[in-house]
């Protein structure tokens, strides 16, 4: 909080990845309540009428968010920034969508997680819809030596640094996508895009401008905060 005061910031965003049990989840709420109290005290003394923001980065994976005290978080926080991305990557056993909106029952391996389930669980858990903010990736996650989405792969490529479009293995800047020779494919059930090159057998999952439009329409329809 002292750092925020010294630099004139508008608030604090807490990124706790992730409370592992009920005790940690309770401690998270206590921490946030204390931060809220100190922000309000600072505002009362130096900026009467001003509301400093308190937000968190929050998981979209059920194993993680099911441990959180959602209703209490919804009360103490201004916004909950949902990390609705990184659903699959180099850490996954199979290729998958990086940030799909929905599950695809006909290809469940491609959608181990989905945004809609997380959003509805947060809301049903007591978080006001207008406090949920949907995170979107501006990069792609790649897989090598694969026959398609939801399939085995071997390697992720990338990581060449400046001028290559990839600063980290398996992750490509949006400006480098789709790569030459790749075909962009839309999964209309999961609501997710990926590119695939049948010659090199490289698959990259990423959000296109059309996908961003779809997500904005989705969050508007549910009254999300942004």
What spans do the regions from the language model cover?
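Short acidic/polar active-site loop segments enriched in Thr and Asp
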Residues: 10-12, 130, 225
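Extracellular low-complexity, Gly/Ser/Thr-rich intrinsically disordered linkers
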Residues: 177-226
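Mobile, glycine-rich extracellular loop/lid and propeptide segments
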Residues: 11-19
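Substrate-binding surface in catalytic domains of secreted glycosidases
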Residues: 18-174
